Amino acid sequence: CGNNCQLTVNTFSDGGRLISGNRCERPITGKKDDGRWNLYEYKRQLILGYKPGENKRGRIGLPLCLNFWELYPFWHTFFTKLGFQVVHSPMSSRKLYLEGQGSIPSDTACFPAKLAHGHIEFLAKLGVDAIFYPCMTYNIDEGLGQNHYNCPVVAYYPEVLAGNCDCLKNTKFIYDYVGIHRPHDFTKKMTAVMEREFGPIPHGEIKAAVEAAYGEYERHMKQIREKGAEIMAAARKEGRRIIVLAGRPYHVDPEVNHGIDTLITQFGAAVITEDSVSQLADPFKTTVLNQWTYHARLYAAAKYCCSQPDMDLVQLVSFGCGVDAITTDETREILREGGKLYTQLKIDEITNLGAVRIRLRSLFAALEEQEET
């Protein structure tokens, strides 16, 4: 949790402590989330578990923001296989946000996008040989929707960073348009990009790195689905309620979600993600054009929830997200038709979780009342 709430701790002569002024229950013994019931924490540890590798051809910096929360295993594997040392920016924090705040051109962007400026500032100061952050119109096609676009902010925010971050004047910033949804074309594109930026690299090496990257991405997503299934099975064995905390890959970032995942586990529920169950839903038709990869997962997860009596969905919405004006209505309708309650939590840079706690208490109280009747 990145909130860093101010606490008053009175320590007595017998070793006892009285904690006051706190806005959450994390300091209280027995309330801390150990990660056992939290798929968000598992996803964070997966990303942080990748090692930089050897520096044979240079150091590449990857910003841990937006779609890199999902694609980091892909790009890390690609570059390390080619002999690059891969370093990433740290998990977001208030300090990191403030460091990049001066280059944010518009206050209308969502908070996760604003955080990207701080990540770029960090990598530029780190002195890497290049920062790699490609523009990506498409995502990998998971077969859940009519198309597989990234939202405009995720797809093209590197253009905004290139035009506004002064720190990039002295740092190589690679933000070419690439498409991982077409492996053959992707290999050709990356061969050209790597030759332009780092000199000739044998095509065979590029091809092997691409194959390894796709394999690692599949392994990463499989790990998430398997861990989700493990948490669900354990929760059902103990009679815990299961909450699908649905959002985007970058909502795993503690500075973005403000510890809401941990807060839900403190209510005694297990927390899983939309991408851990989206493949389990039977095909169905939405009333809106289903063309965004992340949103297609959201709809599929909501549909799957409707078939599971012990599972409910809470949607995280970043303030300023234009596409969520559509997804919230569609998700609400899917859950309503399935007889489920819809809970939306709108989040931005404000860290006070008082209102969120009230919403969640109301949700769990309503669910208990439903069970009793």
Question: Model regions: which residues?
Answer:
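An N-terminal assembly and electron-transfer interface module characteristic of large anaerobic redox
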Residues: 1-373
